[in-house]
């Protein structure tokens, strides 16, 4: 589930992006951030 967030979530140019954050939360993580245009989940 978490891996699909990285693939599916579009990341903007800077910082947080809602889609990534939401996806990570659904995957059971605390939050999601964008790092180098990729979604990363924070446990």
UniProtKB/Swiss-Prot annotation:
Disulfide bonds join 5-23, 11-34, 20-39, 24-41. It comes from Centruroides sculpturatus. GO terms for cellular component: extracellular region. This is Potassium channel toxin gamma-KTx 4.12. Pfam families: Toxin_17 (PF08086). It comes from the Eukaryota. SUPFAM superfamilies: Scorpion toxin-like. Keywords: Disulfide bond, Ion channel impairing toxin, Knottin, Neurotoxin, Potassium channel impairing toxin, Secreted, Toxin, Voltage-gated potassium channel impairing toxin. Expressed by the venom gland. One of its GO terms (molecular function) is toxin activity. Belongs to the ergtoxin family. Gamma-KTx 4 subfamily. Coiled coil: none annotated.
């Amino acid at each position: 589930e978490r891996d699909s967030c990285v693939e599916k979530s579009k990341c903007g140019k800077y910082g947080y992006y809602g889609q990534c954050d939401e996806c990570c939360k659904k995957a059971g993580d605390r939050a999601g951030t964008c790092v180098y245009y990729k979604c990363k989940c924070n446990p």
